[in-house]
Curated annotation (Swiss-Prot):
Catalyzes the transfer of the enolpyruvyl moiety of phosphoenolpyruvate (PEP) to the 5-hydroxyl of shikimate-3-phosphate (S3P) to produce enolpyruvyl shikimate-3-phosphate and inorganic phosphate. This is 3-phosphoshikimate 1-carboxyvinyltransferase. Its main location: cytoplasm. Belongs to the EPSP synthase family. The lineage of its organism: Bacteria, Bacillati, Bacillota, Bacilli, Bacillales.
Length: 432
């Protein structure tokens, strides 16, 4: 990775932009289009490093995936014709690829090995392996907890499973494995987590029932799958950086078009509204994956907030940049119930606090979150993304509060989810 990036951007930020396609939906669209025999087209996908790893793996399984301007054309022989891979399936830095394919490949019964980069090797997989093994999956990890994951053929059984954590990745691994079971599977969630797998199953003609915190699949649901075209909305997790940037930079007025506002993902909008931020939604569409244009204007005197409970899984990936936003509130804010942050690309509780504290902000890490005090940018210490794309972008947004350039090590980690992030931020500066 590039050792150091100097961020020298000042406000106000003004203009209208779109952000790249949603990462979670792009992964799932590639997976489902690859399972279905025939041609599916995925419009405006995210072609960052993570989603490319998912594409690479399905190509090794025998799926033809072509990139054509702003779309992917997936021509699949169908899951029954998948090849047995004769090399390790490399998932890179992608937890979504690793965990969802652990379930899918177990269901398919394809002998394979999943392995990622150093970061993935440090992220626990037991939360996925436990339910998969209860489904009779033949899957093992190093010390039964870490990659590489070794998968061998088995006959998957349906289960009645109560989730241990509010994790869309764990839920989705179970759901993908359940497609191949001769029995129904029932999942009971602790809190609502992002439901893209459920909505996209339906889009590709796979029956699934969801009511409240209960999700039920039918036996051998894979037999219903059909190819489908899918339009990927803009990623709200990527939009979050521009939302916060506009809120904290005097004189800013930014509009982001075609952003996915699925209610299981739109926690940042709820949080900004609770803090009194000037945010407006318009051009809203309805459907399984609703979208909107979002206008954000600079807002002084933001109110402090307590972020906890069901709000946390709805904003889990945005919490680092939300923590930065909270430093600009008029009182102390808290984030609780966010243990899930510990098993992301980094322990984001610690990395958020450590990097922002280096710049003079005042954050206290706790076992399950952060205490964030009103504070200002005080020093231009060199900071580090620690190869975590969301930490890198959060630090770039923090630089808007500085009168001097900020140096960020390993900044090219942002390419995992947002190639072109910095040019887009500079575009708003130039228009301002």
């Amino acid at each position: 990775m590039v050792n150091e990036q100097i961020i020298d951007i000042s406000g106000p930020l003004k203009g209208e932009i779109e952000v790249p396609g949603d990462k979670s939906m792009t992964h799932r669209a590639i997976m489902l289009a690859s399972l279905a025999e025939g041609v599916s087209t995925i419009y405006k996908p995210l072609l960052g490093e993570d989603c490319r790893r998912t594409m690479d793996i399905f190509r090794l399984l025998g799926v033809d995936i072509k990139e054509d301007e702003d779309k992917l054309v997936v021509n699949s022989p169908g899951y029954k014709a998948f090849k047995t891979p004769h090399q390790v399936l490399y998932t890179g830095n992608s937890g979504t690829t690793t965990r969802l394919l652990a379930g899918l490949l177990s269901g398919l019964g394809i002998e394979s090995v999943l392995s990622g980069d150093v970061s993935i090797g440090k992220r626990p997989m037991d939360r996925v392996l436990r339910p998969l093994k209860s489904m009779n999956a033949n899957i093992e990890g190093i010390e039964d907890n870490y990659t590489p994951l070794i998968i061998k053929p088995s006959v998957i059984k349906g289960i009645n499973y109560k989730m241990e954590v509010a994790s869309a990745q764990v839920k989705s691994a179970i759901l993908f494995a359940s497609l191949f079971s001769k029995e129904a599977t029932i999942i009971k969630e602790l809190d609502v987590s992002r439901n893209h797998t459920e909505t996209m199953f339906r889009h590709f003609n796979i029956p699934i029932e969801a009511e409240g915190l209960s999700i039920t699949t039918i036996p051998e649901a894979i037999r219903y799958i059909k190819p489908a075209d899918f339009h990927v909305p803009g990623d709200i997790s990527s939009a979050a950086f521009f939302i916060v940037a506009a809120l904290i930079t005097p004189g800013s007025d930014v509009t982001i078009h075609n952003v996915g506002i699925n209610p299981t993902r739109s926690g940042i909008i709820d949080i900004v509204e609770k803090m009194g931020g000037n945010i407006q939604l318009f051009n809203q569409t309805t459907g399984a994956e609703p979208t909107a244009s979002i206008r954000i204007q600079y807002t002084p005197m933001l109110q402090p907030i307590k972020i906890e409970g069901e709000l946390v899984p709805k904003a889990i990936d945005e919490l680092p940049v939300i923590a930065l936003l909270c430093t600009q509130a008029v009182g102390t804010s808290t984030i609780k119930d966010a243990e899930e942050l510990k098993v992301k690309e980094t322990n984001r509780i610690d990395t958020t606090a450590d990097m922002l504290n280096l710049l003079g902000f005042e954050l206290q890490p706790t076992n399950d979150g952060l205490i964030i005090h009103p504070s200002e940018f005080k020093t231009n210490a060199t900071v580090d993304s620690l190869t975590d794309h969301r930490i890198g972008m959060m630090l770039a947004v923090a630089s808007l509060l500085s009168s001097e350039p900020v140096k960020i090590k390993q900044f090219d980690a942002v390419n995992v989810s947002f190639p072109g992030f910095l040019p887009k931020l500079k575009l708003l500066e130039n228009e301002g």
